[in-house]
């Protein structure tokens, strides 16, 4: 194959991948998954991955491998379904890039350039997992994990790291103003900004933890109020959604995207982590909080809402579903954007009415086998009437 022939082949394959129609798959009544991933490393533009100059790249080989596209924040903006994607290269470094779709389920195309995120303080080794919030103050905020090497690590320890919550804001998703990293007495990941003021303050869902990986004595989804996003300092924090022994969130849990407001309460999507023989298993779960007090949990169905299925189980980090973006349309349709195994992005759709019904009418976890059997028998009895 000549250089020109290979280039035409690459272009045709790339266009076919992007424009392939994505079909829904009938589900459990709560949501419908879609058959194909919406974003992978292969969706990245060819001019990101290849030097297209025959003189400098006569074999037309990849010069910058885009290995994965996952863990994306989401927002409806100018009539388009927008994802701020965690893109990872072969060098393990993540960066943010915007992809947009006209319909939310397929035809996602990356913008021409990745986001150039300004640094704050010591340059970050890695940044990832942005949550987007269009706040009532008029700004779009992005909060993301900032990873740096642990300065107290022992000589030769090249794995220890420190996590902080990076904060940035924008009006156009192109030009970002970097604000100071969040200050907290603990390491923080999975920090999410509530979309409305609460008692005149900005409200944050937090996830305090003792270490970069381990929750230790910390963990759980926290709640904190702050005066300003221009310098976020957490001084008073409470846990509103706890970890619990022998559940899908016994090791860790964390808020996903910002909650969706409904007449019955705030809908929350979160992830829970438990240990198993193959390592850490990440699943998604839901809960609801009160409209009057968004820190008060009013419903939480037992177990997981979504878990890896089929080939979703396979990837760089096996047995993982993670979500940090969803979009609720004005007609009540909800687009749930989730990643599988730190490798690719998917979408599932539902409605606000169905998700509220799921949360309010699915019984909570009673924490023992005996109570689970009672819960099942109650359903059987109702169906036999």
Regions found by a protein language model. Name each.
Residues 1-71, 75-125, 134-192, 196-251, ...:
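Beta-rich carbohydrate-recognition and catalytic domains
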Residues 311-328:
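A conserved acidic, glycine/proline-rich C-terminal tail/linker
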Residues 131:
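Glycine-rich, Trp-frequent "lid" loop and neighboring beta-strands that shape
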Residues 327-335:
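Well-ordered alpha/beta subsegment
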């Amino acid at each position: 194959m000549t250089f020109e022939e290979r280039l035409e082949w690459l272009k045709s394959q790339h266009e076919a991948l992007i424009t392939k129609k994505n079909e829904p798959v009938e589900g459990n009544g709560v949501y419908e998954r879609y058959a194909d991933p919406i974003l992978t490393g292969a969706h990245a533009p060819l001019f990101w991955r290849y030097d297209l100059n025959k003189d400098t790249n006569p074999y037309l080989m990849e010069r910058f491998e885009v290995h994965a596209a996952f863990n994306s924040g989401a927002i409806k903006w100018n009539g388009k379904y927008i994802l701020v994607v965690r893109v990872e290269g072969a060098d393990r470094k993540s960066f943010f890039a915007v992809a947009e779709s006209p319909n939310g389920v397929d035809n996602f195309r990356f913008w021409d350039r990745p986001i150039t995120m300004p640094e704050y303080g010591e340059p970050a080794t890695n940044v990832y997992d942005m949550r987007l919030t269009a706040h009532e103050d008029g700004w779009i905020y992005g909060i993301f994990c900032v990873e740096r090497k642990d300065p107290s690590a022992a000589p030769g320890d090249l794995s220890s790291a420190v996590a902080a919550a990076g904060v940035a804001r924008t009006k156009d998703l192109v030009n970002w103003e970097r604000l100071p990293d969040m200050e907290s007495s603990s390491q923080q990941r999975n920090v999410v900004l509530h979309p409305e003021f609460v008692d005149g303050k900005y409200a944050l869902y937090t996830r305090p933890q003792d270490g970069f990986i381990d929750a230790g004595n910390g963990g759980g989804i926290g709640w904190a109020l702050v005066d300003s996003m221009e310098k976020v300092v957490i001084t008073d924090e409470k846990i509103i959604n706890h970890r619990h022994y022998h559940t899908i969130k016994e090791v860790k849990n964390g808020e996903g995207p910002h909650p969706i407001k409904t007449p019955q309460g705030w809908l929350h999507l979160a992830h829970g982590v438990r240990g198993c023989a193959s390592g850490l298993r990440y699943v998604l779960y839901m809960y609801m909080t009160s409209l009057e007090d968004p820190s008060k949990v009013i419903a939480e169905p037992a177990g997981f809402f979504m878990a890896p299925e089929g080939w979703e189980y396979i990837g760089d980090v096996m047995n993982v579903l993670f979500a940090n973006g969803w979009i609720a349309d004005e007609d009540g349709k909800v687009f749930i954007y989730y990643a599988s195994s730190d490798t690719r992005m998917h979408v599932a759709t539902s409605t606000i009415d169905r998700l509220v019904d799921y949360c309010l009418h699915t019984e909570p976890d009673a924490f023992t086998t005996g109570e689970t059997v009672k819960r099942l028998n109650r359903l059987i009895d109702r169906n036999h009437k």
